[in-house]
Amino acid sequence: MRKWAILLLLAGLHGFGWTVQAASCPTPEEFVVAADALPATKAAIGRRALTILTLGGAATLGAPAQGTEYTYPSRLKARLAEALPGVTINMVVLAVPRQSGVDLDLKLSAELAATNPALVIWGAGASAAGRGDDLDTFIGSVTQAVGKIQSSGADLILMTLQYAPSVARVIDLPPYRSAVLQAGEMASVPVLDRYELMRFWSDTDFLDLDATAPETRVLVARKLYDCMAEILSKAIVDAVH
């Protein structure tokens, strides 16, 4: 059970006739991105070509879902393509599990230069929490990476680390969640609070994040990633409307 939970942790526009699918994943409150928070994304959509860089740990690769088509980046691409007809969506995945801040900085610099994304979506904190990294050091590395992303001209959406009950019993997750929220507030970038979303889904039995049956684990992972994609796609499209 703990292995599965740790895998989870580490692991349109109306004017143009664009629409967003109706929500099927319950949320305690709607994730809203301010209208002026995604200027590069809006400009890219206007050019009918949007490149998104998804940055995170093992969860970005979505191994528990057993299929790349079920990962959250793949599901986000599919949902945005449906919501934004006529716009080419290029989804770049940079998974950096268990990497140091220095390694992340080097890989991020190279990927920003190579792909020139309009939007970066970064789920930070899982590896740092697993290692028990010093919080000030973690906040510093996140702040540095945020500055690099913003200096490149890309928009940014941060995400807090993921939650699972069995992981929360053995790893102190809340300080790293708070650190990402703090970094987002300091940089004035939107933050999707995955930790609270997943805790809500667990507490309301919407998702069994500690499922043990293999078939159930796969189904839970696929639903989890699709829910994240649903919430992100709606927020992005609403923001550039």
Which ranges hold each PLM region?
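Cell-envelope and extracellular/periplasmic
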Residues: 25, 93-99, 121-130, 185, ...
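Extracytoplasmic/secreted cell-surface and envelope-processing proteins
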Residues: 62-64, 101-103, 128-133, 166-170, ...
